[in-house]
Structure formats: C-alpha cells, structure tokens
Curated annotation (Swiss-Prot):
Chief location of this protein within or outside the cell: membrane
Catalytic-site annotation from UniProt: 118, 136
Protein name: Lipoprotein signal peptidase
GO biological process, one term: proteolysis
Topology versus the membrane: Multi-pass membrane protein
Compartments reported by the entry: Cell membrane
Metabolic or biological pathway: Protein modification; lipoprotein biosynthesis (signal peptide cleavage)
Keywords for this protein: Aspartyl protease, Cell membrane, Hydrolase, Membrane, Protease, Transmembrane, Transmembrane helix
Molecular function terms from GO: aspartic-type endopeptidase activity
Length: 161
C-alpha cells in the first residue's frame, strides 16, 4: 500500500538542504570578504563572495518588507499545496520540500543579515551566470521537479480520457 505522505523524507530533505545552505553561507562570510573569488574549475566555476539584497539578478533591491511578506505567503502556500495536492506522490513531495527549503534558506538570510549570501559563480556556455547559492539551486530543482510532475500527470490523464 502506498503511503499518503512521506513526511520523514520531506522533513529530512528540507533539513539537509537548509543545513548545507546555511553552513556554506556561514563559511563564505567568515572566510571571504565580499568580492573575493577563488577559481575552482577554470573558465567554469568560481567561489565568489557576493551579497544580494534583492531577488534573482538583483531585482527589487532593498525591498525587504516585500520579501518577508511574500516569502511567508509562499511558505504557507507550499504547506497547503503539499497537504492538498501531493498525496501519494513522493516526487511532488520532494519537489515541494526543495522549494520550501530554498525559500526558507534565503528568508533566514534576509531576516538575519538584511541580504542573501551568494557564492556559486558559474560561466555556462560562455554566459557569466548570476552568482547564486544552495537555496537558489534548491528552488530551481524544485521548480523543475514540479514541472516534470505536472507534465507527467497531464500525459497520464490524457491517456485515461
């Protein structure tokens, strides 16, 4: 019999992502000055200490109250979505856990520091991608997983009709 909710997996996933996110940001803040950069893989990956008081690409810089309110709403919506829409679907529950962990990780930074610590600096196919962190990666992977699940469900539902 399939379990309705995989709470322990979801909580563990959220906890692991949050720990890696917060510890990595702490290590960056204690060991590097803003702007310091270390090349890890030439022409591909650097660790660069950066701060962002906005969202992706620095949009809405300095709008902390907005981010506090929106993040709290998003976290509540994710919990509701998990309960109402993710029953019996481990993949969707993992996706929501990744989204929750990513949103919470950056929220913690905003509350404690007034900005988000970013440090993963990549050059992908010649494009100097904006600097990001583990929470951002978790959000991105979570969104991809949600999209995959929705497409898969749409295909299955179409076959059943």
């Amino acid at each position: 019999m399939k379990k309705k909710y995989y709470i322990s997996i979801s909580l563990l996933m959220t906890f692991i992502v949050l720990v890696f996110d917060q510890v990595s940001k702490w290590l960056i803040t204690i060991s590097m000055k803003v702007g310091d950069s270390y090349e890890i893989i030439p022409n591909f990956l650097n660790i660069t200490s950066h701060r962002n008081n906005g969202a992706a690409w620095g949009i809405l810089s300095g709008k902390m109250l907005f981010f506090y309110i929106i993040t709290i709403i998003i976290l509540i919506v994710l919990v509701i979505f998990y309960i109402k829409e993710a029953q019996f679907n481990l993949f969707m529950q993992v996706a929501i856990s990744l989204l929750f962990a990513g949103a919470l990780g950056n929220f913690i930074d905003r509350v404690l520091h007034g900005e988000v610590v970013d440090f993963i600096d990549t050059n992908i196919f010649g494009y100097d991608f904006p600097i990001f962190n583990i929470a951002d990666s978790s959000l991105t992977i979570g969104v991809i997983f949600v999209i995959i699940t929705l497409i898969k469900d749409a295909i299955i539902n179409k076959k059943e009709v």
